UniProtKB/Swiss-Prot annotation:
SUPFAM superfamilies: Ribonuclease H-like. This is Probable transposase for insertion sequence element IS701. GO terms for biological process: DNA recombination; transposition. PANTHER family: TRANSPOSASE. InterPro entries: IS701-like, IS701-like_DDE_dom, RNaseH-like_sf. One of its GO terms (molecular function) is DNA binding. Keywords: DNA recombination, DNA-binding, Transposable element, Transposition. Involved in the transposition of the insertion sequence.
Amino acid sequence: MVQPRPAAPTVKFVDEYCQWYKSLFPDVRSFEAFKYLHVGCISDLKRKTLPEIAKIVGLDNQQGLHHFLTTSPWDIEKLRTLRLELILQVLKGRPIILIIDETGDKKKGSKTDYVKRQYIGNLGKTDNGIVAVTVYGVFCGMTFPLLFEVYKPRERLQAGDKYRTKPEIAAILIKKLQSMGFKFNLVLADSLYGESGKNFISVLDELNLNYIVAIRSNHYVEILPRQHIQYLKWQKFQRVFSDLSRENRFIREIIPGKRGELRYWQITTDPENLPDNTTWYVMSKYPDITPREVGNFYGLRTWVEYGLKQSKNELGWSDFRLTHYPDIEAMVGNYLQCLFNGVCIRSNCFSLHHNESQNLFHILGGIMEMAGRTFLTIFV
């Protein structure tokens, strides 16, 4: 029997990380394409398109990479499962903070599946594009992607699709992660989810999860007759950022009627003028939480929305010109999330361990044990 040739080597840390997924690929060429895409996306290419990646890894053209993404018979669900199993093995049962975020990308025209003129959070405006509900984990200062699902607008549904709101999608993803064995000590989300009592907040309550969510300034809370709203004194705290720099912020509790399990907060940079763009209203369900903890925990969600977007773009998150949902799911969702985790390993193992030949789990374990030295950024 003729033995298949070994896959061509690339960068050592890419080869080591990709070995975890080797069993998914039916032939050597598919596995090589998997590795080549890793190398191309972590390179300094300005645009991480398939033609440019093919050039930088020494291929004659992009056909092999395109075939890998669109027709090669590797299983998307198995890739996702292996990636999550790797994270679970490193966590060893320890809980994580869960962040719900929407990742949107601007798209021209209407050929791309599920494209629509809609609000794209990371752009801060309404534009033509696609939006995915994404769930991230935070552990000891490291941020990493877990699951995603593209939001399918009602008017763009295809045969067999079922319409789900973004809060409904987020609730399904949380349940899926919990069923796999992930444990959460806190869930963070913006006001779209904080104002979705039936489809999101009720699910968190059902799962007995702690949460801090943004709410609108006119959020409705029912109080009894003769009860009134109390605004407690402002407390100053220091917001600690990803680079460990600090900034003074102010927080006060708002008590509608009588303090209960749900607590309400106002956070701002200027308690005198309450500027709209730096004043937030927050609802928490977290026993014995302090005002400072509310302010800094909620800031983690802002980091994902703004800081992590830059990191994803460095990996070419929005550079791939794919129009069909299965291809988008394979590349932008699952493959790039797999790549994201791989770069997490690289950016930290060089600072923690100088011997690249160490076992993958040992490297990952070392990353997780950083105990909050700094937030993870893609390139250190």
